[in-house]
Curated annotation (Swiss-Prot):
GO terms for biological process: complement activation, classical pathway; inflammatory response; innate immune response. Disulfide bonds join 678-705, 679-712, 692-713, 1525-1600, 1546-1671. There is a cross-link at residues 986-989 (Isoglutamyl cysteine thioester (Cys-Gln)). This is Complement C3. GO terms for molecular function: endopeptidase inhibitor activity.
Length: 1673
């Protein structure tokens, strides 16, 4: 950084001092202070120093002496230890440094000061991952390329970098400290990490920051989700980027190519939709044939005009194209979608962002414009005309043509006028109204003296830039020289003087273009006139080809190779450059093209260092400097304004025009705009299949809306009936449709083959940049590999080579297609595709290896096999049906051998088998204080609900702060969903999310902990809060009250909650006083009763948001809650709102009058806090305090809390208890009793779930507020330094970790085996929080806890009659059937899900209707819900649901309320996307939003149930499945001897042998539970507690139960393996499988019967023998 100071003298005037310094300087950088001394004959001493802005602490100083005309440089180094003066806002970069130059000579003394904004961005780190997308449990590799800002080509060494791995919820899951070593030579390898098996899908980030710059992060992003690699890539390529409303057709090219460059032939099914944020409207669907990978589809304009006769109404929409391509070679299906195709009137957009808005009369004025298509892409080779007008006169009109980037430029020389009007317009072969046009006004430069810089604006590296400087002034003879500077990335890299040419002609400066000027630099020059006037100008020059030919890859030999082939690469680059290599499967980029490292991304990172704000000079002398990123200070008062922001001010954008929509049907035209939607919704067919009269019951609103809906609905019904009498055409299902549709989320990744490889580093150590040849071996994948080289050198910085594409293929090969996962016991198909690219046909034998625990069609132990003939240049599919019997990963191996040939192919991939049931999560938290040493235990027992023989994943995480886990989940919308683990999806969710974010910002600002979480998170949270505030204002009514939606009645409680949050938010963002005080005034005027209480006339939708407010003593708790909100706003509104204090006093009097009668714990707690806020010494406050203290509950661990009543109407106990305890904690903090408060905090900490939240929203928000207040109020900050040793002796698990101040906010989850106790040994000092979470599949009950709701779920096949008919078809939406490949492209089947529920109120309920109600539907394997149906159910005026969400195969549906007097029913379709049989039943649950534990759960399945073996099951497959079942021995079979039974009981692995009577049989989900009363214990095994008459559970799968045939109350001999789990009574339970022995065993009373006497003799001998000998013999 250079500080330029000029001292000028004249004979008649005092000398002038000029300081020009970059307005943003870098912490830790060298500040080169250039002192330019002119026209002096004496020595000048200059003392230059840098100071902290507020404290004036001297940071650095140097003294230099100038002699005559020689300039000098003083170098100051700013360290990294500059104190941050704004402790409460440590994430902000608004801190200044004062630079002072004191000039002394015999005749002159002057001190002048400049201020520069301090930037912490000392460098940038380019981060590269080995691919852009991963699945859970996959390893991520990354590397970093660190660069300096001052010199991006100087590789920093011996600095440390902090690397944070941040998950999709914004939580730091891992922190790594990396030291840049000299041996790294520019490429720092990160420590690879594995994504946890249980991870939320979304975008993860790797943040890397240099030491000394804690708030500047460089990042790389990657996506995490389950995905597949497609078989081939489909591309949609419109001939035009936009659809113009005057075009008659829209032509689209459809291309499809395999990733080995082979072309796909087949059929493309193309659908066109109009979208504007509402339900997509199908415009047209058609099919086209693909020949050699290419096909053509055309959308006629007339199709659009059928929906909107007025073409301009289409401008409100965008066009979406979806296509499904079915290959004729192998009947494989892939899809593509192109969204956001604009429908426009103008084809082009013209901007001039790089052109100055100020001109200098009689000097050249340079104008550069950028022309883009309406979709934002560059308009290449487009004719442009330009004219400049002065009044009515036009100056030199010009015609140009854009280059490949859409750029063109021209120069004019304007006369001496004050204003120019510049008009630039495209001149293509389109009508005039379709051209693009830009009109702007340029103003005259403010000074009467000018300077002009004439340069070539784009230069290549290595060229020499000729700069011509021209001065225009009436004092031209006084100008002797120019001073110029070259700035790049905010740094002055070059400065000098140039003597002015005699005669006033242009003075030439030659500037060699060097790498440090790339990718863009500024040239600024000025001269000084007598009297001190400074005349300046600046220009921006682009530098290209910095990386051209600096790094490249080439392949020796042919570019097409076979898998496993060795290849030789030539790597050409800069000498001594370090190069990182990477090869990625092109199919990966087809799945996700985002997050790739590109050269453009590197350039943009470098450009962010530029502190200038415009491309050219500003309005006047100071503007030229400030716009170039410089501060200018002179002793004559000509100064720039101190810079306040690192970035540039944003230019306000023009608001988009609002486009009206034409009514879409003539029926709708009969109604006014207000009620038109009512008619349109009536025209649509209901997904529920209900008639108009039934639908009418759900229509709310004015009578006109109801009438419009009914009339239009009846007309549509009549029309459908008339059309249904006509002929129907149905596309029949073709044979190829029996194959699975490839779906991105269901198909397994190619785990056997790498998706990326070649992750190595090389050094160009040879001369001329040629590296020794690199030899690599290709993986086995048939694909094209995208090989990339990234180079970092001292001369060029970071450069990327053009990708080298390596095709890996064979003439004959096979591909194995597997779903991502299947459930145990479900029948599915293994699909193998045989590709033959030879000319002749091949006869092939394809075999599948036998896999233990997977049933297939093998016979007598032989491999399943199929013989097939594949034509030349063709493909064929062979399938192997299987039924997996064991959970886990199984290797599926396929081999194909060609008859008569010596070649073949083989593939092995992993099939993931998941357990039955539904996923469940159990969590526990504990707060631990350590003084020196502490040992404690946590139970880690396996739940009795776990699916038999399935895995339990248990994770344990530790954080060194009670609030850490909660805080990091409060900073953005996605993370809050992790904090509050209940559904969100209605209007009030905005406040649910704003409140915790606000509290977190206040807390972290107060305790100055942003650095440990990540300083970038503060700006993100501020932005999120601002968006929330802006969004919440849309719910405000004209009278300043609030409701969930504008049309709903105003809610007192919600308005008060808004007041509370706004009062807090004002501490961190700008909240208009009227927006805060208006709601307070509304409450006081409209919602306060005569007795001082506040009332609620319009309840919120989220009644759960209210927490304990409401129910018994609701009028008291409501008044207390509202009073608290008004109290918090008092400092802002106490004066402006009339009757403010009077209202509060009346509310206090009301509460005081009720204290003695209060019974509910929650009401006591909130009332006490409200009274304490108003007057803690009042009699009512003391009285309520006594009540609160008397109701305190103490735990043995020293914790204290307040237990709410279990019969509470509003919430289940734990949530209300948390909320009451939070108010209790706030009360103790008001009394400054921190010792007791600590005990309360400990209890609250242990109530949290794994994500840091509690049971609901209000208790989470209140607990966060109270705990944060405790942390802020505590007198001293508790430091932490704790060593932990976590062990589980039963599982041989041991993990050691350390928690320090640096890592206290880092959450590192560790996987721990389930079962047994966990021992935690802690040593050191500090407090930490330990959280444990278990994730498992639990047995889905057929019904559960249906005391609050009833629920019915039925499934029916979708009826052909639901297909859209004629003109009403687009209203009804596409009714997709199994056969409709043209509509859906691979949907296997369509079913209708019918759901009915009813509320069952309790005696103490005050309402006969539920509050906000949720239905959670777990989707059947391979099925997805029909979104169009769901949207219609939500958006139509006969509204059936309030909202819906789809996450991770779970559909969540919201209702405002459910009645108790009748069933509330609706229906929607579900579509089968993956072929599967023997589908396991899954659950649907209904519950009240604010009481998620009280669920009513029902099982559902397809019609027919598929509980037994599928009728499609082949004989061999069925027999295999049956073999896995326990086989009941023949009844009273005397051929089975005593010895046979003894051997069976004593064989290895058999743990028990019991005789017991079956008391009960219960079906639970996919399993049957038998309750057995044990009569005789023959062999007890591990179950040492078992005795006769004891009860044990025996479990068998429902698919096996029919063969087993156990009956009540018969007696059986049962032998089998040990029980892995225990029931709720801590008793072992046993799974019956193929190793089990089940035999009917007669009771003694039956042994007198002749037909069983022989068998009974064997029975007695066996029992006696086992009792005497056991298994010892």
């Amino acid at each position: 950084v250079l500080l330029l100071m000029s001292v000028g003298t004249s004979v008649t005037q005092d000398p002038m001092v000029l300081l020009s310094v970059p307005s943003v300087i870098l912490i830790g950088s060298d500040v080169n202070v250039l002192v330019d001394h002119a026209a002096s004959t004496e020595d000048v001493s200059v003392v230059v120093r840098a100071e902290e802005f507020l404290t004036k602490k001297q940071l650095a100083t140097q003294t230099i002496t100038l002699t005559q005309l020689d300039p000098a440089i003083a170098t100051l180094k700013l360290g990294f230890d500059i104190e941050n003066p704004d402790k409460t806002n440590s994430a902000s970069t608004k801190h200044h440094v004062r630079l002072v130059a004191k000039v002394e000579s015999k005749s002159f003394n002057k001190e002048i000061t400049a201020h520069a904004l301090l930037s912490y961005r000392s460098g940038h780190v380019v981060v590269q991952t080995d691919k852009p997308i991963y699945t859970p449990d996959e390893k991520v590799k990354y590397r970093m390329f660190p660069m300096n800002r001052e010199d991006v080509h100087r590789i920093p060494v011996r600095q440390s970098m902090t690397v944070d791995i941040v998950n999709a919820d914004g939580v730091i899951v891992e922190r790594q400290i990396k030291t840049i070593k000299a041996t790294d030579e520019g490429i720092v390898d990160g420590t690879s990490f594995t994504i946890p098996a249980i991870s939320k899908h979304g975008t993860w980030k790797i943040f890397a920051r240099m030491s000394g710059a804690p708030n500047i992060n460089s990042s790389a992003e990657f996506d995490v989700r389950e995905y597949i690699l497609p078989t081939f890539e489909v591309k949609i390529n419109p001939k035009q980027r936009v659809f113009h409303i005057n075009d008659e057709e829209f032509v689209v090219d459809i291309t499809a190519n395999y990733f080995n460059q082979e072309l796909v032939s087949g059929t493309a099914y193309v659908r066109y939709f109009l979208e504007n944020g509402d339900v997509p409207k199908l415009v047209d669907s058609s099919s086209t044939t693909l020949v050699a990978g290419e096909g053509l589809s055309i959308l006629k304009k007339e199709k659009l005009l059928k929906l909107f006769p007025n073409a301009k109404d289409l401008l409100a929409f965008s066009l979406t194209i979806k296509t499904t391509v079915l290959s004729s070679q192998a009947a494989e299906t892939e899809e593509a979608e192109l969204v956001g195709i604009k429908i426009v009137e103008s084809r082009y957009q013209i901007t001039a962002t790089k052109t100055s808005r100020y001109f200098k009369p009689e000097l050249p004025y340079f104008i550069q414009v950028e022309v883009r298509n309406a979709d934002g892409s560059p308009s290449k080779e487009v004719d442009v005309v330009a004219k400049v007008q002065v009044g009515s006169a036009t100056i030199n009109p010009q015609k140009m043509r854009t280059d490949s980037n859409g750029l063109t430029s021209f120069t004019v020389t304007p006369p001496n006028v004050n204003q120019l009007t510049v008009t630039v317009r495209t001149d293509e072969r389109h009508p005039s109204n379709e051209q693009g046009e830009l009109v702007y006004t340029a103003q005259k430069y403010a000074s009467a003296s000018y300077m002009h810089i004439d340069v070539t604006r784009i230069m290549r590296l290595g060229e020499t830039l000729n700069v011509f400087l021209t001065a225009k002034t009436t004092q031209l003879n006084a100008v002797t020289h120019f001073t110029y500077m070259v700035l790049t990335r905010g740094v002055i890299v070059k400065t000098n003087r140039k003597t002015k040419e005699s005669g006033g002609g242009p003075s030439n400066v030659r500037i060699p273009i060097t790498p440090d000027m790339a990718p863009r630099f500024r040239f600024l020059a000025y001269y000084i006139l007598p009297g001190g006037e400074i005349v300046a100008d600046s220009v921006t020059v682009e530098v290209t080809e910095l990386c051209k030919s600096q790094v490249s890859l080439s392949l020796k030999g042919r570019p097409t190779l076979e898998p496993k082939a060795m290849l030789t690469l030539d790597l050409i680059g800069e000498p001594d450059a370090r190069v990182g290599l990477l090869a990625v499967d092109q199919a990966v980029y087809a799945v996700n093209r985002k997050h790739r490292l590109t050269q453009d991304r590197v350039w943009k990172a470098m450009e962010t260092f530029d502190t200038g704000c415009t491309a050219e000079g500003g309005a006047g002398r100071p503007g030229v400097f400030s716009d170039a990123g410089l501060a200018l200070i002179t002793s004559k008062g000509l100064n720039t304004t101190d810079r306040s922001e690192i970035g540039c001010p944003k230019v306000p954008s023009r608001k988009p025009r609002q486009l009206s929509m034409l009514q879409i049907r003539r029926e709708a035209e009969k109604y006014t705009q207000e009620f038109r939607k009512c008619c349109v919704d009536g025209l649509k067919m209901s997904p529920t299949g209900q008639g108009c009269e039934e639908r009418l019951k759900r229509v709310t609103g004015p009578k006109e809306c109801v009438d419009a809906f009914l009339q239009c609905c009846k007309k549509a019904e009549e029309y459908r009936k008339s059309e249904s009498l006509g002929a129907k055409t149905v596309l029949r299902r073709n044979d190829f449709m029996e194959l699975d549709l490839m779906n991105e989320d269901e198909v397994n990744m190619m785990a056997y083959f790498p998706q990326s490889w070649g992750w190595n580093k090389y050094k160009n150590s040879c001369k001329y940049g040629r590296h020794p040849q690199i030899r690599l071996q290709l993986p086995d994948t048939i694909t094209t590999w995208n090989m990339q080289a990234v180079s970092i050198s001292k001369t060029r910085g970071v450069c990327l080579a053009d990708p080298l594409l390596l095709v890996s293929t064979k003439d004959f090969f096979i591909k194995l297609h597997l779903p991502y996962s299947v459930k145990r016991g479900e029948q599915t198909e293994i699909r193998v595709i045989l590709y033959n690219y030879m000319e002749e046909s091949l006869t092939i034998l394809t075999e599948m290896d036998i896999v233990e625990s997977i049933c297939s069609t093998s016979k007598s132990g032989a491999k399943p096999s199929q013989k097939s003939t594949v034509k030349g240049k063709g493909a064929m599919v062979v399938s192997f049906p299987i039924v997996p019997l064991k959970i886990g990963e199984h290797h599926i191996s396929i081999r194909s051998r060609v008859y008569g040939r010596t070649f073949g192919d083989g593939v092995q991939k992993i099939l993931r088998v998941a357990p039955e049931g539904v996923r469940d999560i159990r969590s526990e938290s504990r707060s631990v204080h350590v003084e020196e040493r502490e040992t404690f235990f946590i139970k880690n027992e396996i739940s009795p609900d776990v699916v038999p023989n399935s895995d339990v994943l248990t994770f344990i995480s530790v954080k060194g702060d009670e609030l850490a886990e909660t805080m990091v989940n409060c900073l953005d919308a996605k993370s809050i969903s992790n904090l509050i683990q209940i559904p969100t999806g209605c209007g009030e969710q905005n406040m649910i999310k704003m409140a915790p974010t606000t509290l977190t910002l206040i807390y972290l600002d107060s305790v100055q902990e942003w650095e440990k979480i990540g300083l970038h998170r503060r700006e993100e949270a501020i932005g999120f809060l601002k968006q929330g505030y802006s969004r919440e204002l849309s719910y405000r009514k004209a009278d300043h009250s609030y409701a969930a939606f504008i049309k709903r009645p105003s809610s007192t409680w919600l308005t008060a909650f808004v007041v509370k949050v706004y009062s807090l938010a004002k501490r961190v963002i700008i909240v208009d006083n009227q927006e805060l005080c208006g709601p307070v005034e509304w409450i006081i005027k409209n919602r306060q009763n005569s007795d001082g209480s506040y009332r609620e006339d319009g309840p919120v939708i989220h009644r759960e948001m209210q927490g304990g407010v409401g129910g018994t003593e609701g009028h008291v708790s409501m008044t207390a809650f509202i009073l608290i909100g008004i109290q918090q706003a008092q400092e802002y509104c106490g004066v402006s709102v009339p009757n403010y204090k009077q209202s509060m006093n009346r509310a206090v009097q009301f509460l005081a009058s009720k204290v003695s009668d209060l019974k509910r714990m929650y009401t006591i707690a909130i009332t006490r806090y409200a009274l304490a806020l108003q007057d803690p010494e009042s009699e009512a406050a003391h009285s309520s305090w006594k009540k609160l203290e008397n109701r305190t509950t103490f735990e043995s661990k020293g914790h204290r809390y307040w237990k709410a009543e279990e019969t509470s109407h509003v919430l289940r106990m734990s949530a209300i208890s948390v909320e009451a305890t939070a108010y209790g904690l706030l009360t103790y903090l008001r009394k400054k009793d921190y010792e007791s408060a600590r005990e309360i905090v400990d209890w609250l900490t242990e109530q949290r779930n794994y994500g840091g939240g509690f049971q609901s929203t209000q208790d989470t928000i209140l607990a966060l507020q109270a705990m944060a207040q405790y942390k802020m109020d505590s007198s001293s900050k508790e430091l932490i330094d704790v060593q932990l040793e976590i062990t589980s002796p039963k599982n041989n698990f041991e993990k050691k970790m350390k928690i320090t101040e640096e890592t206290r906010f880092v959450q590192e989850p560790h996987k721990i085996p389930p079962g047994g106790n966990i021992t935690i040994k802690a040593s050191g000092r500090g407090t930490f929080t330990l959280s444990i979470m278990s994730v498992f599949n639990k047995v889905a009950p057929s019904s559960k806890s249906c005391s609050t709701f009833d629920l019915k779920v039925t499934m029916t096949e979708a009826d052909d009659g639901e297909s859209p008919q004629g003109r009403l078809g687009w209203f009804d939406g596409k009714r997709r059937r199994r056969r409709d490949i043209g509509d859906e492209g691979g949907v296997e089947a369509v079913y209708r899900m019918n759901m009915c529920t009813r509320y069952k109120p309790r005696k103490e309920d005050l309402s006969s209707e539920s509050g906000m109600t949720i239905i959670e539907v777990n989707m059947l394997t391979g099925f997805i819900p029909d979104k169009n149906d769901l949207i219609q159910l939500k958006e139509s005026v006969d509204k059936y649901i309030s909202n819906y969400e789809i996450t991770d195969s779970v559909l969540i549906i919201y209702w405002d309320k459910v009645p108790s007097t009748e069933d509330y029913c609706f229906a929607f379709k579900i579509k089968q996307m993956l072929r599967s049989d023997m589908i396991q039943p899954v659950t649907a649950s209904v519950y009240d939003y604010y009481s998620p534990a009280d669920k009513c759960t029902r099982l559902y399945n397809l019609p027919g149930g598929y509980v037994e073996l599928s009728p499609l099951c082949q004989n061999d497959l069925c027999q295999c499945v049956e073999v896995s079942c326990p086989a009941k021995k023949p009844k009273f079979d005397t051929s089975i001897t005593v010895l046979h039974r003894q051997e069976a009981a004593c064989v290895a692995g058999i743990d028990y042998a019991y005789v017991g009577i079956v008391d009960n049989r219960t079906e639970v989900g996919s399993f049957v539970y038998y309750t057995v009363n044990i009569q005789t214990v023959i062999k007890s095994g591990q179950d040492q507690a078992i005795q006769p008459k004891a009860t044990r559970l025996f479990i068998v799968t429902r698919s096996c139960d029919g063969r087993l045939g156990m009956e009540t109350p018969r007696q059986y001999l049962l032998m089998g393996r040990k029980g892995e789990t225990k029931d709720r009574n801590d008793r072992f339970q046993y799974v019956l499988d193929a190793s089990s022995w089940v035999e009917q065993w007669p009771v003694d009373e039956k042994c007198n019967q002749p037909n069983v006497q022989t068998f009974c003799a064997i029975k007695r001998e066996y029992e006696f023998s086992m009792q005497i000998q056991g298994c010892s013999s």
